Amino acid sequence: MRSILMIIVVLFSSACFAQDSEQQLYYAYLDAEMDIWARHIDSTDWNSLPIAEQTVLLNYEYGYAAHAIGAKLEDAAYRLEQFAKHLEAHRAHLDSGIYYCYKTGVCSFRLSFERRQIAKQIKGIYENIKRAMAISPNDPFVLTMQCNVEFFNPIFGSKQKALMYDQKADSIYNTHADQYNYPRWNIRAMQMPLLQSMGYVRSKEEVLQKCNEILTQEPKFSYITGTFLPAYLKEKEKDKEKEKKK
């Protein structure tokens, strides 16, 4: 009887730890304290994890690889290849749409390192996101990736289409979040390109309204208060000055 109780205690403690860990990682994302993510990833043994927990860790590795590349960290290439390696190892346990969505991310990230293979990576981006959308057209994670593909393509991309995809993802997260088991940071990551797209194609009032809506949900979202809003308002002031000079 005592041994059974001990097992229950251990399992309960593990569940609480996992929950606390996810909450800690979520707030670290809000505060842009990504070194906490690095420590979490580095201290977790991929091979010892159950399949479900590998799926979760893979999502954090994806997010951290994006951060490392954007911040130009010394280990950015390593972080990308670590994620890419685990993605292939875990492929059989992922929905096909999500696998191709992640592959889109890998190709996008490799543009930062493989300058001689730009055409190959761009082709990979479009082939993989097309497959992902064909398989999982209503998955918010896939829709967010499609938004990014549209937003960051300076030639063939469309800010209007990017906004359309991200608004759909936003709506699905708000109404059917329980159907998707992504860690919560993915919702906030979706809202970053959503605001960026709105900044291009919507009025200042609409953009500020959306910022207030998100901050009402999550007041500690530092990307909005510390990065997006200051840059957006500064750009709007420049536009106003240009109009005065005409």
PLM feature spans:
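Sec-dependent N-terminal signal peptides
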Residues: S3-S14
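Boundary at the C-terminal end of the N-terminal hydrophobic targeting segment
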Residues: C16-A18
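Amphipathic alpha-helical repeat scaffolds of TPR domains
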Residues: D20-A28, N47-I69, L94-F113, N138-P154, ...
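Short coil/turn connectors between adjacent alpha-helices in alpha-solenoid helical repeat scaffolds
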Residues: Y27-D35, A65-Y78, S108-I122, N153-L163, ...
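Alpha-helical repeat scaffolds
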Residues: W37-N47, D75-H90, A119-R131, K159-Y173, ...
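Short coil turns that delineate tetratricopeptide repeat
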Residues: L94, P137, N174, T216-P219
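Extended amphipathic alpha-helical interaction segments
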Residues: A119-I187
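Terminal, low-structured helical/coil segments at or just beyond the last alpha-helical repeat
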Residues: Q179-K246
